[in-house]
From Swiss-Prot:
The gene is trhO. Disulfide bonds: none annotated. This is tRNA uridine(34) hydroxylase. NCBIfam families: PRK00142.1-4 (NF001136). PROSITE patterns: RHODANESE_3 (PS50206). The lineage of its organism: Bacteria, Pseudomonadati, Pseudomonadota, Gammaproteobacteria, Alteromonadales. Catalyzes oxygen-dependent 5-hydroxyuridine (ho5U) modification at position 34 in tRNAs. It comes from Shewanella baltica (strain OS223).
Amino acid sequence: MTKVVVCALYKFVSLPHFESIRAPLLAMMEQAEIKGTLLLASEGINGTVAGTQEAIEALLVWLNGQNGLDNIVHKLSFDDEMPFYRTKVKLKNEIVTMGVEGIDPLKVVGTYVKPQDWNALISDPDVILVDTRNDYEVQIGTFKNAVNPVTETFREFPEYVKQNLDPAKHKKVAMFCTGGIRCEKSTAYLKEQGFDEVYHLEGGILKYLEEVKAEESLWEGECFVFDNRVAVNHDLKKGQYDQCNACRMPITEVEKQSPAYVQGVSCPHCIDKISDEQRKRFVERERQVNLAKARNEAHIGSDVNQVIEARREKKEAQRRLAAEKNNAKKSQVL
């Protein structure tokens, strides 16, 4: 069986004409039968895609030939099945959304630490180790002694820093994320806030798992990934977790035995949070998914990435609307 190559990539680079890249990039991906999502913005490119080894190599060569997109940071892993259902290239304001204006990793960023040197750094008692990922990601795996900020989205990370970290007290801060991109912005943000020694795991967790032997590793658990594999183990192979199609939380086989778990409808994490209307919608979606499977077709309802992204976009739209209303009220007062 031909292995599917999964490629996570990103690069912060000034792309003033990023809109013009979308069409030829999408055409190249479709021709090579590459699936997944790439984001383009004026600050660079980010995303995860999958295809044959030849297709992924062709994509990297194609990107390398585009002005500014050479030498892209990328990590490869492998799967027996295609983890995506769609091919998408999206235009965004940011390639990773922190929501803080003026943060530019091209101008200032933390000190990169190679995976081989990471254990020594985080074993230093003077270093505070912070996991920049969301809480549901942290729950299934993290580094030994890492602090969990308990955030739902990356937008909440700046507030966590304001409330919990102090440049005068926390002299050395080390941070990590899945592939490294969130730390590009989080370390840049900390530097802007006056923190002096700020460190960043180069290549993220995925690069660490790739290069550090399991017997020497300080990683505990599995690493959440934003595709249908849900999580990967230390060998970068699909882990033991599944995902609830209702709330998107990772779930174990034990949790799937719970009366609260209904495939595509609910799980122990969300059984008390979903409304009757949502439940009916999820039941119908699951019915459509099963019909599509019976016809040997992919159904939009089973596309994990699309559901996650839609939920995030909805939350961001709600935040923007709330901010606009708040600004309008302030203007009326003035």
